[in-house]
């Protein structure tokens, strides 16, 4: 039986290149396997994700921004497509697209996020989001730019 979420944080943030797999693709597909994570710290974080956790979808590339929310629908498991046993995947489902994207520039300009991994460790593809940060991001997504 899968463990239920014990997430002590607001949730997680997963990054993806929209040319590879966009939030629109996820909305179309409904759900997908989140794979391709190879960085050791990102893998450590991904192993802590649990079914029921909330995740922000952050698009990288030209228009860096948080664009929507996902729900994790499985606990981490080995990536069956890879020979390296340390690589893990989770299943995710689209939850909702935000009213407007919250750009990296907005995030960097807000002191609330000064110590967040998204600002300090820009290469990290899976990271924690505190409840306070999550609430602030939601407010920003609802504001006029």
Residue ranges and their predicted role:
Residues 21-24, 64-67, 80:
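Short acidic/glycine-rich loop or secondary-structure boundary segments that cap or lie
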Residues 1-18, 79-145:
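Contiguous surface segments at macromolecular interaction interfaces
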Residues 36-41, 74-78, 111:
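Short acidic (Asp/Glu) patches
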Residues 10, 30, 51-53, 66-68, ...:
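A generic structural signal for short beta-strands and their flanking turns/coil linkers
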Residues 65-75:
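Short beta-strand-centered aromatic/proline hotspots
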Residues 58-64:
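Short, charged beta-turn/beta-strand-edge "cap" motif at the junction between a beta-strand
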Residues 1-51, 144-145:
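Compositionally biased, charged N-terminal/linker segments
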Residues 56-57, 71:
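Hydrophobic beta-strand signal
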